[in-house]
Amino acid sequence: MKAREVNFDGLVGLTHHYAGLSFGNEASTKHRFQVSNPKLAARQGLAKMKALADAGFPQAVIPPQERPNLAALRQIGFTGSDQQVLEKAWRAAPHLLSAASSASSMWVANAATVCPSADALDGKVHLTVANLNNKFHRASEAPGTERLLRAIFRDESRFAVHGALPQVAMFGDEGAANHNRLGGDYGEPGLQLFIYGREESGALVPARYPARQTLEASQAVARLNQVDPQRVMFAQQNPAVIDQGVFHNDVIAVSNRQVLFCHEHAFLHQQALFDALAEKVPGFTPLVVPAGAVSVQDAVETYLFNSQLLSRDDGTMVLVLPEESRRHEGVWRYLNTLVAADNPISELKVFDLRESMANGGGPACLRLRVVLTDDERQAVNPAVMMDDTLFTRLNAWVDKYYRDRLTQEDLVDPQLLREGREALDELSRLLSLGNVYPFQQ
């Protein structure tokens, strides 16, 4: 059956700030306490969505979550009115107020793992919410993510949204950022490749930074998503690159249809993995970047692999990159060599996403890929699909509510909380979401 990939991009939230919350993510740590610009961040994300929609790639939006997350602060012992909770957290533990105010839900590659209907035993599209167990500021996203996904993928005859795995280290799950799908046409059954960083009894783990995804979590997600067992493989990411800042697989590899674009050091036992993929995926095309051309450090700094690989109707592919890749002489030289060579990648598209990039999130982090047939696409909440009207409305909404400067000190301001709730109340109507936010209950 004919199907297309729809990219659902996360809309940056009003509390986007730099707090260095993500140990193992070097950009996040490097830009700690810098001044952020939430308005610019949201506009940069919207510009990418609209440009890709205009280029013929179906595009939709996932709204931000309510932040500061007062329920999370109350759960860890801060009491009183909303304003008192903010003030007590700020005085006692500003890093916890930062965590509860994080706009990290913008990186929807970590929202869920998706199984297209062609790969599922029951013929439905499945989405399993990620628990993001490794980081407090992200683990609190799961309930909000589930509500938002249910408001977008409402038709239970076509879509199955599953809640997150248990919030324990054994089932640490980071969503689609550690998941690749390979195959032919999108509507045909494909092969799902789950990438993990550690397993419960395994000795091979990184030494410096945490491995956030477990094999046990990947296996559980595959079961929940009803992936045909004949169409799934599990592979371990190279622990050495995790220690160099590759905290998710989408920082060192990206796949699309038959192509896997990755670094020479991306996977443990990489050649054996490629041999297995070649047996299962007709026309499997690994495009491997040698360390001599691009080091792991340069890949992390430029987010060369945190890119989007998109298919045109003629079978060629477009690689969507952050501006940082163009500014690095060696990486840009390599990319131009790649495009000139005999492979499906025929064009580079570059976007300025520096507000997101400074927190460690590139083009791939900002999107959740969902393969949908025409009928399934018709069943998605139509209000979230990107077009001229939605683009204009969302930009006007951002201009109305977002600040152009935010520091950690601003998070205690009760006016920021009020602005956020007013904005999200309006957004929930604009996107026909219903009452999805806690303050609306």
Swiss-Prot record:
UniProt family annotation: Belongs to the succinylarginine dihydrolase family.
Enzyme class: hydrolase
Cysteines paired by S-S bonds: none
Function comment: Catalyzes the hydrolysis of N(2)-succinylarginine into N(2)-succinylornithine, ammonia and CO(2).
A UniProt-annotated Pfam family: AstB
Keywords: Arginine metabolism, Hydrolase
PANTHER family for this protein: N-SUCCINYLARGININE DIHYDROLASE (PTHR30420:SF2)
Protein name as catalogued: N-succinylarginine dihydrolase
EC number: 3.5.3.23
